[in-house]
């Protein structure tokens, strides 16, 4: 029986307990990995264990053999991710572009795409195949797994518009095939069981003209270059847009453009982008985000919701309270 204290990060001890139980897994299992090295913010504590499966079959075996008491956290490219300074207990599973980054054309307008595929690589593959409708991925700084989970979108198009089927594993390693209807998509959200791990998806666009597709991608790239701090350490859009306006607008109107806590700052260029100016901690970033939420609510009664995913536990004595005006 596995007896583990997940309040204290001790990857070596956890690895020693789990190795005899995991069977013939083929992926790389590493203790005490610095999460700052795998996130775009370049912040965060240790992953107690860090697993990189080689394929879906390997991941299924790992999940099947992993005791249910062990917490599991999934990461991909690490763009839309804030890792807290106290680290991530249990196992962090990363679906890498190397092992889950295939883009296979399966029809005149469709691709089978691995969840570890960078969005911009999907856009490039669609350009090469002259399949329209994927240009917006050229402007999303992330991977397909995250795009499927949050219904990522840009330039008026969302991931839901391209999905035919999504392939997932549950916490026990069982495979599931989800239709577009099964995903229950809404703005920056899908409603599926929390333990599901996306491994790939069947996506479809429309036959297109290469010059027109390239022009659409160039327009996306120019927009990003002009209005977003793409050369900074950032996680992309910090908050979801409210129903009746843009997040950046209410942030700006509340006087939060350029607001800074420690090494974290709301970008002067695009104030819905939070940046690490050099030495930010996870605490700095999350404290800044919650401060912005409070100021925006006080100014306009808009309650901003995080778009960036926050994982892990706080460092002892340095927790950040989530702003809640109703309690």
Curated annotation (Swiss-Prot):
UniProt keyword annotation of Flavoprotein present: yes
Gene3D superfamilies, A to Z: 3.30.465.10, UDP-N-acetylenolpyruvoylglucosamine reductase, C-terminal domain, Uridine Diphospho-n-acetylenolpyruvylglucosamine Reductase, domain 2
A Gene Ontology term for the protein's cellular component: cytosol
Catalytic machinery residues: 188, 237, 307
Pathway(s) served: Cell wall biogenesis; peptidoglycan biosynthesis
Catalysed reactions, semicolon-separated: UDP-N-acetyl-alpha-D-muramate + NADP(+) = UDP-N-acetyl-3-O-(1-carboxyvinyl)-alpha-D-glucosamine + NADPH + H(+)
Stated role: Cell wall formation.
Full protein name: UDP-N-acetylenolpyruvoylglucosamine reductase
